[in-house]
Amino acid sequence: MKFWILLLTVSAHGIVVFLHVFGSLKEKPEEIEQCWVQPPARFCGRRCTKVQKCVSPNYTCCWTYCGNICLNNE
């Protein structure tokens, strides 16, 4: 009887490990590049979303001294 409990425990552990590994195969977030200009402090309020995207079109998420902000592509 104890053998079956051990077998069940090992099988359950194996399933949990595989689920953890497969979960890491999801799409990785894009790497954020440094902004091409040093923006003034007033742009520091325009933050990127948690998935490193910008809400407004024609804006790009980049990192600066004040964190990840959205800058106009123009």
From Swiss-Prot:
Signal peptide per UniProt: 1-19
Gene Ontology molecular function terms on file: serine-type endopeptidase inhibitor activity
Subcellular location(s) of the protein: Secreted
Listed GO CC annotations: extracellular space
Keywords assigned: Secreted, Signal
GO terms, biological process: antibacterial humoral response; innate immune response
Protein name as it appears in the record: Protein WFDC9
Higher taxonomy: Eukaryota, Metazoa, Chordata, Craniata, Vertebrata
